[in-house]
């Protein structure tokens, strides 16, 4: 069922907070979480082949972020380890939608949550209102409804 598909299209990738990512309060600077989400998308694209940035580019498209939501729950500090869970959210629209949960690797507590939406632009920079063929094929391959 759809619940199985939803559970199946999840990537988990680990990270360790680097010194360069913290601010003067010794916690991860808020903007770094956007990069952690990107790390999650990249890992997702490697696991679910065909939806990585280079796959999209090779198909003649770009997929810029047009919406990003981020909610901070608990700070991370230098050398903390965390797990970024990236979930693909199926949609009929010509968009790529993800939800993210970042958890502390030590206690499993949620440190941040969010979502992103990407659209498709062709080589001329034109917004695609219909899903590109490579995206439709990717959905078929991974049994996305």
Summary of predicted features, one role per range:
Residues 1-6:
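Short, small-residue-biased leader/transition segments that mark boundaries at the very start
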Residues 7-83, 89-145:
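Terminal targeting signals and extreme-terminal segments of soluble enzymes
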